[in-house]
Amino acid sequence: MSDVHYKKHRVFRETEDVIFYDISVEESNASDLVVHTGPATSPPDDSVGAKQFYIHSFQDDYNRVVSGERIFELVNYSWKYPYHIVHLNVHNGTLFIPRGTFHRSQSGKDGSIVINQAKRYEGFNPDAEFYPVSCATNMELYNVFVK
């Protein structure tokens, strides 16, 4: 079984040319709208060109693409295979990224819009949760890519 998990949406109503989706995430206590206006990478590479990642200690992410597409790179040392590349579009469902997982995303050429129906834990501080970690300075993270 894969360590990468999705929460699927549920269609609860359809009319001519209209589909209503229930995209609820029961665990969620926060919602963020993340807009890439072009082919952005978040977080961007550092000043020497090394990949950077976010890692949350007090937040789980539940990312759903609502427009465009994103490629997520995930690194979690506790997984059987620590490194995953996930292609996410409007049909995949919600990608669950547990706290303690290094992650970054890249949009397609036209950008993308993601809703993150996050679960934030006591102690959450956006200044601490969104600090990029570089492969150039974190040897354990670097070693995931050179093996």
Q: Which residues are covered by each model-predicted region?
A:
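Histidine-centered metal-chelating micro-motifs
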Residues: N92-S105, E122-G123
